[in-house]
Amino acid sequence: MPVSALAFEPLVDVQARNMGEAQADVAIRGGIFETTGFRAGAVALYDPQTGHYSAEIPAAPAMLSAPTVLTGADNALGGWNANAGTIAYEWRRVRTGGMASAGAGDNRLWRAEAYQGWVSPVGAGGRRLAADVAGAWSDSDGSRTFGESRFRRYNARLQLAGDGGQTDLFYGWQSKFISWPNLYTPYNVIESDDLRTELLVLNHREELGGGDFVAAGAYWRRNVDHYVYNRTGATPGPSNHTTWVRGAGAEGRLTTGTFAWNFSANFIADKLESDTLTWGRFNTRNHTRASLAPETSWALAGARKLTVLAGAVFDDTNRDASAVSPVARLALANAAPGALADELYVSYAASSQVATYTALNSRPSAGLFRGDPDLGREKARNTELGLKGARGNWAWTAAVFHRSERGLVDWIYSTSLPNARVASAVDIDTTGIELVARYTGRRLDLVLGYTGLRKDADYGNASADASFYALNFPEHRLTAAVTVRAGRGWEIRLDNEARRQKPNALRVTGDDAVLSAVEVSYTPPRWSALRLTAAVDNLWDSDFQDVPAVPAARRQWVAGATLAW
């Protein structure tokens, strides 16, 4: 499950409700779930109802690459409708082979997954036809009363691939039922969400050499949502929503003479049908986005190279005002022995995005979720200074950044409206530092991270006694992932996180937390295709609330086996 794989990634903050695979928001650099985008190949994936559902990507991890986290200028050029950052996946090359896994744990947890890939021995034009299929299943009663979840996912893909490029035709279907106390609201009720997500993608990428490439794609997505605020009460009744998205995108890098031209374009058409989100001005919207940023380089003395990039991004919809956002980056590469960093860079990137329908079309004057049809385009300016380096088995990155956002749509709580959560625009400045070090060895892997954040917020005339999202952030966060290959087939993985959260009136369990997960695996030396695992999540049984007022999942264990062929 793609979101679960990000749980202890130092560049990403996963805010889970129950297990990450049940429901989780993904935040980057102190942003919120609505300011995080997702890409698969050349297309930007999106749910127009709410950013909660943009992370519902019905694709097996075996079909996707490891994610790249885009921030700053990279996000401004390669992201879409995401002012903080983008999780970018590529389509993995199919290989002949497969795997099957099954596991069980406490709270009547069981899970299973299967994958099979085939590559045809017959080729044409230097490329071969391949196909793969996958399925995943998971059920649990949950670690809290009325905390059950059910998950099903099925995938099929055709691929034509060779040394020069790759074409993928993918279909995914996913169903997910989640129930949890205070799933989205702080009113001590049992809420549930029942989702059905379909995704059809056609993507092509052609490698041109020297770092140049061209990629293009198109997709269709449908998400059906059945939300119940109070499972144990008669009112209010359920809410039903269906969204459709049709999108196309292209991106690339082409070198002509001394200039390399970085470009991208996206078109997305969305539609909402809902029995409650009916108070806005529209329920369809067309989005257009294009970016162009040429870059050039100069060789300097001492094995150094200076690269300058400058360009702009154009965003428009048929419902909102358009915006032109400048992007610039200056990078100094240093290949001299003994240099502290392989690259030093400074960048400035402006970006913009528009609100989703839950914020725009919820009833403004009554109800549990209060919307505002007048919410406008959200704008951000990001300035960043950073470095990258690698020596021997170590690699590291460091960045200091400042993001100034105007009109960010947050959901707030006010004692003057104790029975509602309200969509409100906020002007917010975020200053942060981000440090990551990675070590890869024969017996040991380490991933160490630190993030420090500070925010200054202005809600204008809105009465905001607490923020569900924009002011739910760690002032300090340390992560440490340790993988030990102990020999004779044994491997131990420890994922750890320590955080000091910004105080929040809605969080009732404290603002400091130490969270850990451990997995022990064994591969018999004479049967390397088999892997046995035992894992514990929330090892210290912490009650820290990732999302304010949402109870934490308790300690859970699972044991299983994976067979590969």
Region roles according to the model:
Residues 43-71, 85, 89-91:
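Short acidic/polar hinge/loop motifs at secondary-structure boundaries
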Residues 68-74, 85-120, 135, 139-148, ...:
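Short strand-turn segments of transmembrane beta-barrel domains in outer membranes
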Residues 115-140, 174, 218-228, 260-269, ...:
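Surface-exposed extracellular loop regions of Gram-negative outer-membrane beta-barrel proteins
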Residues 140-151, 165-247, 277-278, 282-283:
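Flexible loop and strand-edge segments within Gram-negative outer membrane beta-barrel domains
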Residues 184-210, 241-243, 343-406, 414-440, ...:
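Outer-membrane beta-barrel signature, preferentially recognizing the C-terminal barrel domain
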